[in-house]
Amino acid sequence: MELIDDNTRKFILGHRNDDVRRLALAADKYSGVDVRMAVDQIQGWQTARRKLPSWAATDGIVYPPHLNMEQCSSETTATYKRMVVAGSGNGPRGILVDLTGGFGVDFSFLSRAFRKAVYVERSESLCTIARHNFRMLGIDNAAVVNADSSDMAFIEGLPRIIEEQFHSAERGLPVEEGTENSKAEADSGMQNHIGRLVKVSESATAKADNEVTVFLDPARRDSYGRKMVSIRDCEPDVLALLPALSRFTSTLILKLSPMLDWHEAVREINAAGCVVAVDKANMVPEDDANADGVGPTKDGKSLFTVSSVHIVAVRNECKELLIVAKNCRQKALYGGCEHDYEPKMYCVDDGNVFSCSLKEAMEHSAVALATLPTGDGGAVTTYLYVPNSAVMKAGCFHVLASHYAVDGVGPNSHLFVAGRMIDGFPGRVFRIVAVSSMNKRELKRSLAGVKHANIATRNFPMSVEALRKRLKVTDGGDVYIFATTVADGSHVLIITKKAT
């Protein structure tokens, strides 16, 4: 089936740098052209140039409506997810099942880390677009399945579908005729960090080649468009699927909104999925489980436990929360769910990665606080450290402070100081010029000559706009003012410039 007719395709190529609003208003001028389709495609390509450059560089890609393009993963975040699943292994391995295929951006990147891949999507039209785009992108190891992943009967039948379609000797997955050979993957600077991002065991056995990784990106809005705050409220209900998924899934990867409480999500997954002390008698008999491991326990629990949490930011803006859970079934018959690795937390902002143990990240320990004298007694050689958005979301400030030997400015400021420059700190670094109380005379002296300033507030009783009005400064310039509450409860302004 032809998705775009020749006239419309030619129109798209000839106008893809034009203003789509003007094209839409002049639709009557273009006879024989599906202008609505053309506008969607032109707008999609223009967005892809910024967000998905490898897609924009590929002729023949069909794009969804603008809102879907804005909501889909970027090439940066999709590439990071591929690195997480690929680990340090050599070449493609195992089977990927993406149960929430959508536009197929994540799938198109993830699938290249696997020998075989299955895209599942309940929208028939999206399946048609995905099948076409995968062919254009040269993805030749993928099968497209039109199904609803919230249907428990479908999930329970997935092992049979995989067996029927993909375990035919070494043929790989069935693909459409005319599929091109896979294109070489683009290099990414983030590959330099791969050794620090994940620890994945390597195996050259046939069993490893057939291990299943399930990817889920549950919808985070209800039918009224309201944002959900718990994974229990997302669709499909991940927790409800865990027992069925544990029958055949080795690794589960959840892509969630960074607005969700990751602490609660980890607790819910572990509570629903992990049996720490496994009794063989409590296992489903092997006849009732898949061939390469045990299924859920008799009480209906699965055997998943969270192995890593990844908070992914791009240019200091949190984009995604990734939770990776491992199936304990391979060790369950031998005494429990112990892993050969310690569950980890990764805070990622472009090329900067800060990691710690997940146990440490979930603790709430106090941070040592510094004393910041104001006025003439204020320190002028100290550096101010502002954690990036990924670390802020993780909330592991005590780990950060201990690792980099920095002190907090206040108990809830999430600003840190040290008397030295620190290489690799996950965030921004400023040189403190002065520290001022809110005393009018002291403010006048500390801000003498400052007409422009960038202002941020942390645990401070005034808004940025109200403070700017009081200080009588306009936005911009090379001065950065951080208004906060320090250890003794007083309100201060930390006046800084970017460290060089």
Task: Please annotate each region the language model reported.
Residues M1-T500:
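SAM-dependent transferase fold signal centered on methyltransferase-like domains
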